[in-house]
């Protein structure tokens, strides 16, 4: 580690220590559940693992194994299992306890001690009996095991089996009905919830038959299995979500990875894994069915792979036509298309985004670079941070603005074709755009292909590749780059032709058109039209050839449909007249068509090979046959994509939002208003403000005072829970595990009671304690009841101050703000709305080139734990800082800490960053702000939270708010209650301990020519890994925190729209109209297919689901909220006499039916789809039609 990096971390930890000292002093004085700060510091992964699990001795052993460079983390998990079996780690008296400790620790280790899976995803481990009397291990998994990922899920089973063998427990021997139950259950869970990988029934049965550990779990979902119910060793008839995840996404999907480790263990033998991997487990009927499926699939594959077949034929006959290498189109991203979220390109369709390799400074780690002009031209549906579902290389990506790639090409209403590289120009012309011919380039870094193990797709022929080709041809590229008269990226047409001819190099990309999208027939038509055209000066005068040294050579050709279409397909900028088409800078185009400067053809006929290349749909071979220079494929790979989630920058509230975790039952009304509860009385005889609620039963250890508060009202000592057995009415002391078992009846005692609380006194006392009046806020909201184990309420004083400053409490007492995650490795002070002086005060002394930092436009490399907040987050943090200062001053009696008057005062302050599925917070430092609705941070910061940037969103908390107000006592006592809670904090990020996806990000300033050439052959990414430096290459070196170079710059991190149109448009109908209108404009999109998919995946399921819900609905009292299966006969609520109403209304059932029918007709959907809609329409009409009898008159019968 470099000295300046060490200084950075020392500064962070010094600021953290200052905040910790203030928080410690404050918690001694207030009414918090404990006097200690409840978020322990973990300086490394070993600390996190031990703190989350609470198992002494684990951290020391993990550090020993981490120090061994030859020991992988998976192997370390197995070593730890042996330690648990041999009583070297942990203090477990039972064999089941040892297995449980080993499994939990293995999952914690494999997830870097960050996610909640080890404590929430594994409920318990127990010993059961086989039919032969032997014992076996049964593991109860729960839903939160999902956050561990498939590898950790699968290895948890292997660790359990390994531990089992070491302590002498037999294997699980599945009964036949249990095997069948597993198969039915996985199918049910996949239909109801969905699995990333859903094994077939025969595969599931095969795994269940051979699994040495019984996989069990808690019931999830409402659906129950129809067969194999009420089994003796299975507690529920519902699908067990945790078990399904481990068996499907773990064992079945990760079998090859498990086999790698079973082969290293003498004690564990899973020979059946090879059959699972090879698919040789099939027998009988299933084999026949599988063969039939395979036959069907082979025909499809053969159709898709026709190009490959042609290519192989080319080996036999040298001149045989063949197509260029191309990745197969993938349609998976189009599944589950939602109304209002547009498709930007069908799979690999011309006109869609063009793949370009590289990494911008705000790019990488599952993001996609898009030109800001393209964002505006697609009606602002894409903004910074918007998620897109993409064809390749991954499943999804977060959008980032990159203005150093090519922008979109559009056709205007007057017929002109123009490329747009300026976002301001895009805004000016977008109302006049008739069609979007091309969406521009789509930047993807090489590391994404490594991470997804996706074969490299052919690269766009970009300037960075061409300059290396030019250098290989003998040019002094460095001298050209240094010359003020030469622009290597955007040269003049004359210069581009000179280079091509002098050095025998390929034509510059600026003048290399998309010949691979043009068929040979239209190529010939364009060549013929060009030969019939003439050169014109800008004033329209006709010339036979362009003058020597002319700055612009304008070609005028006769207008015809084939010629116009050819120019549009090639993306040649031109203007359209009544009878002519005018092309500026046309000399490279003319020469590419095989014409002389005098517009004379140099060829008569194309060869058979050129005419037949790629079935005549690709003119690249024809161009290279007639042009006097080499012409490369400009954009061979198109990437289909559609909009996913919109970007997010919003405060995190409970639903509904509350200010304090203090229970008031129903007394606060629908608003949960504490002031209303303070005056509430059930009857005239009741005392106003007295409310019966369920709270903790606690006792002061110093003076024996009984109370429900965390602190004794008499002596202010921290109170302890008092456990009482309801049946025996005796006090029970808890054991070491915290469970209180009655010695008489052996039932579990609890420390909860129903008690009458005088809310009026509590409320008035709280206002008095902090010196506030009721007019300091509009409303103070509490909760109806507490969901924590001991039901300890939070002091109302904190809620008063939150309400005053307009912030709310989360489930653990903290104040949070959510933002979409995006990466950035270098920043400018100007775009962060800070000054160079402010950055220098934070330790940024030099820019990325080593020059002293003096100006706001200099690029500086971002420190690993520095974060950039959205404007919304900055305002929220400012309000939170005011709340914390008032809390310190008015409640704890200390000096204010932040004294923040505006958001500049937040710069340099520490925050917690945290992902929803984890239990570990990461300390960060604010260095600036952005107008985009996202949170920018170093990729390693996001990876430390076990997140990438494919559209994920995480929260930030002001550091001192978390230290003062977080308490485990407030966390819900239910499955998943400890997820999304900072049970531990990481004060320093170790790159070696974060999620390894971030290690696959490339950190170079340019890609070598050999890499680009390898993409033409669609090489495996591993074959070129030695050519490009990745983050993992610097681990353990002095540069592991530095040197994150980029290939592309961008002018502003927030370029393009601040918000996606999905968030600014009105109702769903308005969004869908905009979606379909955009589909009509995009050349790469089939609007009929979009309409069909919206109806099939959104409208039809919604209408059918709402129709079913209407028939099964409950009714609800509008006053007290009481629910009934049917409306009481009186029509009034039995509890309060209020009006009872439906919970599902006619409007929600038929809201989409008319629109769906209209869309199906307008966009020419299949007759099958139209018939389904008509049938549904009749079903809806039959339910809601007015069938009351009308009085008939005699005239009705005449």
From Swiss-Prot:
Q: Does the keyword Hydrolase apply?
A: yes
Which InterPro entries does the UniProt record give?
A: PolC_DP2, PolC_DP2_cat_dom, PolC_DP2_central_dom, PolC_DP2_N
The record's EC number reads 2.7.7.7, 3.1.11.1
Protein origin, superkingdom: Archaea
The segments labelled Disordered in the record are 281-332, 534-553
Tell me what reaction this enzyme catalyses: DNA(n) + a 2'-deoxyribonucleoside 5'-triphosphate = DNA(n+1) + diphosphate; Exonucleolytic cleavage in the 3'- to 5'-direction to yield nucleoside 5'-phosphates
| Any Pfam family matching the protein | PolC_DP2_central
Any idea which UniProt keywords this protein has? DNA replication, DNA-binding, DNA-directed DNA polymerase, Exonuclease, Hydrolase, Multifunctional enzyme, Nuclease, Nucleotidyltransferase, Transferase
Query: Which GO biological process entries does UniProt record here?
Result: DNA catabolic process; DNA-templated DNA replication
Identify a single GO molecular function assigned to this protein.
single-stranded DNA 3'-5' DNA exonuclease activity
Residue ranges annotated as compositionally biased, kind Acidic residues, are 286-319
Function, as annotated, reads:
Possesses two activities: a DNA synthesis (polymerase) and an exonucleolytic activity that degrades single-stranded DNA in the 3'- to 5'-direction. Has a template-primer preference which is characteristic of a replicative DNA polymerase.
State the similarity comment: Belongs to the archaeal DNA polymerase II family.
For this protein, the record's HAMAP family field holds: DNApol_II_L_arch
Assembly, in brief, is: Heterodimer of a large subunit and a small subunit.
Name the record gives this protein = DNA polymerase II large subunit
Q: What organism does this protein naturally occur in?
A: Natronomonas pharaonis (strain ATCC 35678 / DSM 2160 / CIP 103997 / JCM 8858 / NBRC 14720 / NCIMB 2260 / Gabara)
What gene name is given for the protein in this entry?
Answer: polC
């Amino acid at each position: 580690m470099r000295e300046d990096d060490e200084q950075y971390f020392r500064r962070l930890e010094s600021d953290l220590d200052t905040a910790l000292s203030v928080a410690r002093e404050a918690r001694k004085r207030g009414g918090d559940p404990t006097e200690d700060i409840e978020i322990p510091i973990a300086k490394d992964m070993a600390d996190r693992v031990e703190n989350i699990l609470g198992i002494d001795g684990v951290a020391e052993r993990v550090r020993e194994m981490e120090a061994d460079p030859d020991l992988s983390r998976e192997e370390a998990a197995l070593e730890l299992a042996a330690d648990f079996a041999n009583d070297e780690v942990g203090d477990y008296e039972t064999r089941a306890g040892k297995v449980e400790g080993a499994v939990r620790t293995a999952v914690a280790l494999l997830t870097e001690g960050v996610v909640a899976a080890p404590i929430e995803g594994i409920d318990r481990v127990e010993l059961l009996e086989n039919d032969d009397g032997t014992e076996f291990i049964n593991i109860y998994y729960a839903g939160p095991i999902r956050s561990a990922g498939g590898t950790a899920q699968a290895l948890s089973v292997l660790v359990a089996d390994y531990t089992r063998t070491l302590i002498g427990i037999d294997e699980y021997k599945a009964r036949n009905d249990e095997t069948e139950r597993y198969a039915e259950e996985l199918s049910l869970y996949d239909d109801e919830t969905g699995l990333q990988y859903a094994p077939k029934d025969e595969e599931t049965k095969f795994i269940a038959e051979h699994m040495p550990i019984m996989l069990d779990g808690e019931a999830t979902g409402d659906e129950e299995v129809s067969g194999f119910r009420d089994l003796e060793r299975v507690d529920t008839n519902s699908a067990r979500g945790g078990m399904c995840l481990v068996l499907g996404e773990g064992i079945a999907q990760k079998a090859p990875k498990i086999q790698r480790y079973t082969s290293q263990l003498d004690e564990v033998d899973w020979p059946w894994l090879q059959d699972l991997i090879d698919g040789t487990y099939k027998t009988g009927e299933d084999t026949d069915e599988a063969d039939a499926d395979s036959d069907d699939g082979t025909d499809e594959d053969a159709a898709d792979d026709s190009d490959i077949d042609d290519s192989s034929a080319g080996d036999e006959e040298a001149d045989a036509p063949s197509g260029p290498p191309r990745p197969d189109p993938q349609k998976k991203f189009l599944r589950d298309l939602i109304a209002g979220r547009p498709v930007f390109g069908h799979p690999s369709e011309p006109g869609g985004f063009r793949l370009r390799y590289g990494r911008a400074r705000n790019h990488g780690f599952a993001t996609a670079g898009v030109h800001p002009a393209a964002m505006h031209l697609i009606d602002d549906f894409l903004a910074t941070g918007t998620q897109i579902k993409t064809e390749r290389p991954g499943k999804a990506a977060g959008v980032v603005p990159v203005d150093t790639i090519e922008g979109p090409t559009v056709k205007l209403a007057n017929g002109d074709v123009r490329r747009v590289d300026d976002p301001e120009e895009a805004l000016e012309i977008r109302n006049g755009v008739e069609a979007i011919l091309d969406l521009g380039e789509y930047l993807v870094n090489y590391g994404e292909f490594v991470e997804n193990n996706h074969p490299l797709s052919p690269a766009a022929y970009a300037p960075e590749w061409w300059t290396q080709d030019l250098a290989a041809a003998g040019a002094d590229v460095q001298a050209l780059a240094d010359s003020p008269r030469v622009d290597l990226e955007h040269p003049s047409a004359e210069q581009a032709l000179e280079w091509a001819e002098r050095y025998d190099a390929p034509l510059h990309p600026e003048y290399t058109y998309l010949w691979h999208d043009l068929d040979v027939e239209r190529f010939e038509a364009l060549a013929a039209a060009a030969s019939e055209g003439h050169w014109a000066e800008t004033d329209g005068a006709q010339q036979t050839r362009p003058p020597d040294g002319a700055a612009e050579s304008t070609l005028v050709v006769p207008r015809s449909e084939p010629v116009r279409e050819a120019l549009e397909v090639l993306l040649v900028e031109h203007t359209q007249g009544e009878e002519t088409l005018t092309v500026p800078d046309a000399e490279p185009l003319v020469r590419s068509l095989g014409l002389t400067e005098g517009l004379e053809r140099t060829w008569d006929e194309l060869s058979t090979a050129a005419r037949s290349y790629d079935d005549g749909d690709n003119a690249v071979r024809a161009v290279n046959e007639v042009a006097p220079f080499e012409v490369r494929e400009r954009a061979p790979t198109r990437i289909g994509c559609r909009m996913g989630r919109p970007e997010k920058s919003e405060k995190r509230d409970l639903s509904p939002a509350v200010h304090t975790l203090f229970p008031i039952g129903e007394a606060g009304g629908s608003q949960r208003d504490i002031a209303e509860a303070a005056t509430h009385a059930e009857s005239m005889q009741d005392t106003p403000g007295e409310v019966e609620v369920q709270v903790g039963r606690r006792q002061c250890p110093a003076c024996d005072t009984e109370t429900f508060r965390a602190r004794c009202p008499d002596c202010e000592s921290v109170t302890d829970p008092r456990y009482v057995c309801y049946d025996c009415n005796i006090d029970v002391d808890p054991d070491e595990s915290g469970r209180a078992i009655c010695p008489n009846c052996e039932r579990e005692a609890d420390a909860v009671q129903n008690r009458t609380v005088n809310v009026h006194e509590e409320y008035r006392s709280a206002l008095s304690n902090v010196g506030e009046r009721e007019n300091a806020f509009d409303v103070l909201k509490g909760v109806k009841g507490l969901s924590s184990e001991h039901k300890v309420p939070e002091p109302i004083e904190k809620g008063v101050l939150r309400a005053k400053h307009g912030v709310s409490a989360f489930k653990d007492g903290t104040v949070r703000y959510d933002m979409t995650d995006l990466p950035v490795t270098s920043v400018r002070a100007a775009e962060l709305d800070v000054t160079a002086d402010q950055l220098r005060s934070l330790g940024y002394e030099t820019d990325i080139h080593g020059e002293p930092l003096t100006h706001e436009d200099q690029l500086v490399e971002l420190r690993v734990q520095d974060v950039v907040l959205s404007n919304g987050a900055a305002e929220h943090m400012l309000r939170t800082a005011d709340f914390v200062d008032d809390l310190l001053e008015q409640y704890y009696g200390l000096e204010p800490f932040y004294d923040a008057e505006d958001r500049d005062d937040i710069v340099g302050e520490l925050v917690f960053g945290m992902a929803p599925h984890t239990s570990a917070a990461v300390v960060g430092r604010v260095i600036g702000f952005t107008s985009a609705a996202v949170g920018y941070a170093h990729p390693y910061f996001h990876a430390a939270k076990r997140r990438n940037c494919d559209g994920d969103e995480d929260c930030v908390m002001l550091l001192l708010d978390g230290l003062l107000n977080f308490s485990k006592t407030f966390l819900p006592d239910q499955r998943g209650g400890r997820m999304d809670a900072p049970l531990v904090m990481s004060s320093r990020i170790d790159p070696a301990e974060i999620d390894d996806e971030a290690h696959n990000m490339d950190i170079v300033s340019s890609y070598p020519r050999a890499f680009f050439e390898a993409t033409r052959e669609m090489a495996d990414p591993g074959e070129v890994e030695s050519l490009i430096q990745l983050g993992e290459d610097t681990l353990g070196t002095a540069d592991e925190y530095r040197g994150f170079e980029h290939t592309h710059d961008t002018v502003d991190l927030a370029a393009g729209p601040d918000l996606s149109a999905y968030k600014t448009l009105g109702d769903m109908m308005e969004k869908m109209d905009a979606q379909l209108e955009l589909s009509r404009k995009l050349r790469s999109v089939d609007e009929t297919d979009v309409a069909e998919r919206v109806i099939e995946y959104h409208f039809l399921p919604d209408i059918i689901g709402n129709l079913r819900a209407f028939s099964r609905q409950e009714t609800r009292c509008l006053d007290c909220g009481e629910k009934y299966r049917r409306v009481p006969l009186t029509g009034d609520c039995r509890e309060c006499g209020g009006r009872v109403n439906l919970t599902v209304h006619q409007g929600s059932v038929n809201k989409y039916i008319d629109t769906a029918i209209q869309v199906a007709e307008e966009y020419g959907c299949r007759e099958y789809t139209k018939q389904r809609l008509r049938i549904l329409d009749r079903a809806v009409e039959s339910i809601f039609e007015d069938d009351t009898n009308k009085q008939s008159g005699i005239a009705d019968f005449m």
